[in-house]
């Protein structure tokens, strides 16, 4: 598992008219901007369009599209790297954690995974609204399968 890093795509987002430090909800993006964002997401995860979209019907809802929308709205838009004293640090985007891979977590050893998540997310990220970063920030009620819920 690789440690999350500040996004390398802030300039790419800026070229689409977006500020990586202040992303709007994904459903508010204009179609042209959304297509550009999807290309950045694909590059961040090392995937092709049909890895998330249904071939022949790109508008159809799929599990991965739903998860990507939640990741945008709940992670990229609401979190940043700690600037040593609170919100407003370096921006977070898909490439920050995924770094060219769809799956970034090794779930074989729960203790190792828990420590890595604590070190990588709780200790290094902040919520832009100033609330403290806790396990429950993502794992509501300590549900360890929130992505499965998002994909429904």
Residue ranges and their predicted role:
Residues 62, 93, 134, 148-149:
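Secondary-structure junction/capping motif
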Residues 1-46, 51-88, 105-129, 149-152:
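Sequence context of c-type cytochrome heme-c attachment sites
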